[in-house]
């Protein structure tokens, strides 16, 4: 049985349709990422899954149950960690954990949870004295206290330093390793590639692509990217998309307004000399040139025309 089944989901506000008939499923034990620019509909979708919003149309099932029929049982089997969870600052870490334990018929011991999130030494510290990373780990511990089957994480590492981010990644992977299902939204492509078994890219209320990060990257038709920019006056040298797509081993070209460009290529050793020769023939000097492996970010920009962190 899938942990999550979504069929024909729609959500409208007055004349605006935020979610436009999306359908997807999430397997038990899977980390599933919802990616999309601001306003794409991903937050609305997640809030419907969490039982915060009611859909305008469509069906949502979690663990074979629906919010309309089984709200009390579902509340006991999901955990939710928001991007910024407000916790009482004048309570200690242990007091907050015991407060959240009181909400569930079954719960994990405080000492065990604090060990999992590496906060044992902060047990008696006030919440108001914790760092940003420590607060976020505490929020996830609160989400895990009721032994959930599904964990919802809304941009869990936004604003955290790299070390805190990786500590949270380890938490997610341990939860998945124990059989839990995770629904994740994030603005960090590295995070999605590291954690997610599958992702769905949402834009304008519709899922425009779904699959594993590796599958989506392969869908570009090439595994490498050449990024370059032309110097000042050379930026208007007349290099058009058709010129770049005609280069050997080039499968895609993205031109930016500032003269920068990214090419997806199957064989950099063939494409690079041809690109340099093209620029030289047009009298265009390269200000920057680099090659790298294609990433999920390249997939996202190709599909939406925007970077994930764009507003």
Task: Go through each PLM region and give its residues.
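ABC transporter nucleotide-binding domains
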Residues: 2-6, 11-209
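Residues at or immediately flanking beta-strands
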Residues: 59, 225, 285-288
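Short beta->alpha junction loops/turns
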Residues: 67, 103, 233, 268, ...
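A generic structural signal for secondary-structure junctions
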Residues: 79, 101, 105, 218-222, ...
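ABC transporter nucleotide-binding domain
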Residues: 170-266
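C-terminal coupling/interaction segments
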Residues: 268-311
